Amino acid sequence: MSKTLKVVGRLVATAVATVLVGGVAFANLSPELGGKPTKAQRAAYAKSGHYQDGEFQNLIPTVLTTEGNTFTLLWKFLFGKSVDNEKPAAPLPMQMLDSLSITRKTAYMVRVTWFGHSASLVEIAGKNILLDPMLSVEMGPISWITPNRYNPLLPITAEKLPAIDAVLISHDHYDHLDYQTIRRLKDKTAHFYVPLGVGAHLLAWGVAPARIQELDWGDSVQLPGLTIVSTPARHFSGRGLTNRNSTSWSSWVLKSPTKRVFYSGDGGYGPHFQTIGAQHGPFDLALMECGQYDRQWAQIHMLPEQTVQATLDVRARVLLPVHWAAFTEAHHAWNDPIRRATAEAARLLLPITTPQLGQPVTLGAGPLPQTVWW
């Protein structure tokens, strides 16, 4: 028996090593890996106050693994026992988005359409703003390892979207910054606003330099009738095994003369939410990370109850939970995030909207979607 276990152990170890070596080799050749900031850019990043020894830092001490180490996380991801209901049994309900309907709006209307995971279209001040537009079914350069989208289709394709005024990227992980989507959007998007260092990926993928602007925390840009502000998050970055934290990560604030919207990006709970609320709130709506949590990475992703508290911290009137209903990236039931978030929001009397994929949420136009569809 022990001999058999040793043989199995060697086979498993060999398989893991093969996956790692093959993955690194392939990723280093794949354009999806993106680009690298120049030496001059890295020197400039040191002035940001949160870049040290070649890596971006969080505002408070943060570790990637609160239990185990990187190897145990990888082992759990590849071979860990799945939980019940980790993936939906059938495609999720979805409303197809008519591209013509996006053009029908006024400068005063705020409409948000969530596509699943974090990808969302925010129509505000007459502008089309895309948040982390990961609009592909497969993720990353090695799709047989990484999770695929639950639904085989999205509410709309990148090709059918109208002209985009700005794309906002929160960080460079594959489930938020997608090579194929950027390639399809690069010629119809006026501006790409990204955290420090992320511009190198876009340049490598053929986005015109004039369309790319990197923003540090606290930086802002002005479009007619709209202010966009980069604000802190508590996370990490990297698209390979050797470039962790070489680029920054952000949350985002959108301000029109009459409405304000907040997008958390990815990240753990922290005091930055209260600071953002004090500086930029109150918000009419907050799109907040809610999903892909685990006790092994408790400082870089929020529990649903923390999502609700963070929404209160930023002083948002309504919560729209995102970062779920598309990919399985953690060992919890696929609908556990929304069940727990709605329960906690009810307990704390926080309004929450729960649209289906592709269902528009229009502020000030009557009751917001609250159907229990999961």
Residue ranges of predicted features:
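Active-site metal-binding motif and surrounding structural segment of the metallo-beta-lactamase
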Residues: 48, 145-193, 281-287
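Cap/insert and terminal regions of metallo-dependent hydrolase folds
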Residues: 2-10, 26-54, 58, 158, ...
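Acidic/histidine-rich helix-loop elements
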Residues: 135-153, 236-244, 294-300
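Divalent metal-coordination and catalytic microenvironments
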Residues: 122, 132, 171, 178, ...
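Active-site metal-binding loops of divalent metal-dependent hydrolases
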Residues: 133-135, 172, 233-234, 265-267, ...
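Metallo-beta-lactamase
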Residues: 2-147, 154, 160, 195-263, 284-291, 340-358, ...
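Catalytic core of the metallo-beta-lactamase
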Residues: 117-123, 222-282, 298, 302-306
